[in-house]
Amino acid sequence: MFLLLRFVLVSCIIGSLGFDNPPTNVVSHLNGDWFLFGDSRSDCNHVVNTNPRNYSYMDLNPALCDSGKISSKAGNSIFRSFHFTDFYNYTGEGQQIIFYEGVNFTPYHAFKCTTSGSNDIWMQNKGLFYTQVYKNMAVYRSLTFVNVPYVYNGSAQSTALCKSGSLVLNNPAYIAREANFGDYYYKVEADFYLSGCDEYIVPLCIFNGKFLSNTKYYDDSQYYFNKDTGVIYGLNSTETITTGFDFNCHYLVLPSGNYLAISNELLLTVPTKAICLNKRKDFTPVQVVDSRWNNARQSDNMTAVACQPPYCYFRNSTTNYVGVYDINHGDAGFTSILSGLLYDSPCFSQQGVFRYDNVSSVWPLYSYGRCPTAADINTPDVPICVYDPLPLILLGILLGVAVIIIVVLLLYFMVDNGTRLHDA
């Protein structure tokens, strides 16, 4: 009892001296088992090869360049590499995963499959993609890309139907119509194989609208059939619009196996790349840093939409991105957020990272790690320490029971002693 009272007293004294331990707006890690995926703002090789010694180009502290815990590529992103010919093989492994990328596919790039397409659909695709990546990297240690081999028995080749500017879609691949087909009302299939990983993220995409070709309108229809388990995954066009639609993608998490891609109308699509997920781990929320341009360019909030508790913590700066190298590279606010990678921290929460695990001015929500078990609330003159009441209630009950037992024993011995004196 004395030790408990002393702990409460010491904590209150600490509170009166102004020790708050507030959550800080950084990304950090419990220990050295972490990994960061990024772009030019954390690409040390780009700085060395293109901008020698000018580390102001990055938001990452250059002390981390030789850590071996970073997979970053200037001008790229995981989503961009997943879908397009502009490819970088992001590869990394860790218990705690941090993402600071995504800005290299935004409304600024204005990508759409056709001239009458919709970039809004591609922003939706981006959000759905990162949702799957973040959720799965909370339970997997390792991420990399793998090629998906497929076999199509026809003579037609894949076609670059979906392209805009410098971006050319190659995942999924479009198989062109066979020369002997007069229209797109036909069924066609291709085999593809997934092997070597625990699970895979693959795209299943359709044009969700009436696709016009030579005065005829078509409804897209695509399926993947797992020949080992009998499970089928499919999408059918449900919209009646004829303009303003685009390539809607769902991102499936599939096991290894032999699959059949099936098209009942329009062109056959088949996956050519997959995110390879390996090495299951205990649930560990990922951390995502907002990836956006200076306000002179249009950005999106899809990584924020995708990053939701409990599987993900989102960190952002409250000000416009204004770099010191140029307006899009070397921002002080985001440099501060990434500075947390220089040290270990015991506790992570929706509000931020806690540097200490004793008391805090803020109760951590969706907490992970060794987190404060007390909230230190300061009134103007009197520090009040509010603790989780359950341990105190249980201790009070135990003390009450002990007092009752002591009183009963005292009464018993007093009565017994009086009886013996009377007998004497």
Curated annotation (Swiss-Prot):
Segments on the Virion surface face: 17-392
InterPro entries in UniProt: Capsid_hemagglutn, HEMA, Hemagglutn-estrase_core, Hemagglutn-estrase_hemagglutn
Subcellular location(s) of the protein: Virion membrane; Host cell membrane
Protein name stated in the entry: Hemagglutinin-esterase
Glycosylation sites: N54, N89, N153, N236, N301, N316, N358, N417
Transmembrane segments: 393-413
EC number: 3.1.1.53
Subunit structure: Homodimer; disulfide-linked. Forms a complex with the M protein in the pre-Golgi. Associates then with S-M complex to form a ternary complex S-M-HE.
Organism superkingdom: Viruses
GO CC list: host cell plasma membrane; membrane; viral envelope; virion membrane
Effect of L266A: Loss of receptor binding
Membrane topology note: Single-pass type I membrane protein
Top-tier EC class: hydrolase
Annotated spans, Receptor binding: 128-266
One Pfam family recorded for the sequence: Hema_esterase
Similarity-based family: Belongs to the influenza type C/coronaviruses hemagglutinin-esterase family.
Esterase domain 2: annotated span: 267-379
Intravirion side: 414-424
Upper classification of the organism: Viruses, Riboviria, Orthornavirae, Pisuviricota, Pisoniviricetes
Variant or mutagenesis effect after changing F211A: Loss of receptor binding
